[in-house]
Amino acid sequence: MYVCGPTVYDTAHIGNARSIVVYDVLFQLLKFCYGKATYVRNITDIDDKIINAANEKDSSIESISTYYTRAFHEDMRSINCVEPTHEPKAAENIKYIIELIEYLLQSGHAYESNKHIYFSIESYPEYGALSGKKIDELEHGSRVEVGENKKHPGDFVLWKPANDTDYKLSSYWNSPWGEGRPGWHIECSAMSYAYLGKDFDIHGGGIDLQFPHHENEIAQNKSAFAGSMFAKYWVHNGSLTVNKEKMSKSLFNIVKVRDLLDSGIKGEVIRYALFKTHYRKPLDWTESVISESQETLNKFYRLLRGIDVASIEKSDVEVSRDFIETLKNDLNIPEALAILHEMATKINKTNNENEKLKLTESFIKSARFIGLLESSYQEWFTAGISYQEIKRLIDLRKVAKQNKDYDAADKIRDQLKQMGVTISDNEDGTTTW
C-alpha cells in the first residue's frame, strides 16, 4: 500500500491527521487479514511551499523539512498512529525520479521544452479515467503549471530548471537536462516504483489529491511501464471542514494537531473525533465533536477500572469477530465504534464476573485494534494531574465533611469529577478514587 504523506513545510492540521488515521487502521486490518502488509508513506521534502518557507525564514530547505518531519512524527505518535513500513523522502530518491523521466522521454510520453521536461497528457489515451475528467474539457491552469511552451495546457512538469532561489537554497540536483528539481507528481510515482515496484495493491490519499495528483501518477507509471496496472485499488478519504467551512489561512480557521494537544485535548480524543464519519464522507470538525468524543472515551475508560491492562495482550480472548467483519466492509469505522458501544452496554449489564472480564478483555482488544484505549484507567483520568493534587483535594474534602461543611465537600467532589477523578466513600471512612 502506498499513501501520499505530508509536505513538510508546516505542522500537521486535522485534515492531514484524518488521512493518516484512516490508513493507519487500514494497515492494521491488512496485517490482521493477510499476516503481512507493506505500507509506504512518503515525505514530500521538495516543493515550492518548502522553498518559500525556507526563503521567508532565511533557512535551508533541509532545515525546514527536517524540523517539520520531526514535528509530524511527534503529532502522529500523539494520536496513536504507528509508523509505516517505509517512509521515503523525495530528496533521497532523485535517482529513481530521473530514471522514470528517462523512461517517459524514451517512450514518447514526455518532451523537453525551454529546459523543462513535460508529460504529454494527449499521449496517454486513458487520461482522466480515475477522476472522470476529459482532456478537451480541462480548464487552462487547473492546478497544473501553465506555460507558453506546452503542447497542451494540461501538460504537467516532470523536471524544471533551477532558478536563483534554488541556487540560493541549494534546492537543485544534477540531471541529464541540467541542474534543476522534480515536479511534485513524478516524486510519488518514482517512490512507489522504488519501494513497491511497477504494480501494487492499494494507493491511498485524500480526495483532494484525486485530480490532478493521482491522475498524473497513473499516467506517468502506466506510460513508463507498458502493461502495468500500477495500483489495483484506489482509496480516497473525504474532505474535512471546520464549522461547515473549508479550512483556509484567509478564514483563520486552520486547526493544528499541535494546538489541540497544547490546549489539553488528549491525542486519543482527536483520533476518536476523526472516526466520527465514514472515511469516504466529509467530516465537519466542531467543538461538539470533540466534547462528544471526550465523553465517550471517559465512559469507555471507566470500564477499565481495576483491570490490569498490561496483561490484556497475553489474554487468549480475541478481538470481536463482528468488529473485524465490520471493518472489512469498506473500513466502516463508525459502525465498528457502534459495536464498541454495544459491548460497553453488555459489560455494564453483566453480573457474572468471569463473563464480565472476558467481555472487557475483548472490548479492550477491539478498541486497541483501531488505536483506542491505549492507556489504563488510572493514566487516562489522571493525565496531567499530580497524585499529590488529588490527595490534597481528597484530604480537604475529608476535613470539610468532618466540619459538616457538606456544600464545600460537594464542590470538591465536583472539582475532582471535572478533573476526571471519580471518588467513592467507604464504610470505614476512607475514600478511594
Swiss-Prot record:
Superkingdom field: Bacteria
Gene3D superfamilies, alphabetized: Cysteine-tRNA ligase, C-terminal anti-codon recognition domain, HUPs
Record's keyword terms, sorted: Aminoacyl-tRNA synthetase, ATP-binding, Cytoplasm, Ligase, Metal-binding, Nucleotide-binding, Protein biosynthesis, Zinc
Entries under InterPro entries matching the protein: Cys-tRNA-ligase (IPR015803), Cys-tRNA-synt_Ia_DALR (IPR015273), Cys-tRNA/MSH_ligase (IPR024909), Rossmann-like_a/b/a_fold (IPR014729), tRNA-synt_1_cat_dom (IPR032678), tRNAsynth_Ia_anticodon-bd (IPR009080)
Locus of motif 'KMSKS' region: 246-250
Cofactor, how bound (note): Binds 1 zinc ion per subunit.
One Pfam family linked to the record: DALR_2
Binding site for ATP: 249
Catalytic activity reported: tRNA(Cys) + L-cysteine + ATP = L-cysteinyl-tRNA(Cys) + AMP + diphosphate
GO cellular component: cytosol
Gene Ontology annotations of biological process type: cysteinyl-tRNA aminoacylation
Subcellular location: Cytoplasm
Residues at which Zn(2+) binds: 4, 188, 213, 217
Needed cofactors: Zn(2+)
Enzyme class: ligase
Locus of motif 'HIGH' region: 6-16
EC number(s) recorded for this UniProt protein: 6.1.1.16
Keyword Protein biosynthesis among UniProt keywords: yes
GO molecular-function terms, A-Z: ATP binding; cysteine-tRNA ligase activity; zinc ion binding
Subunit structure: Monomer.
HAMAP family associated with the record: Cys_tRNA_synth (MF_00041)
The name this protein goes by in its record: Cysteine--tRNA ligase
Species per Swiss-Prot/TrEMBL record: Wolbachia sp. subsp. Brugia malayi (strain TRS)
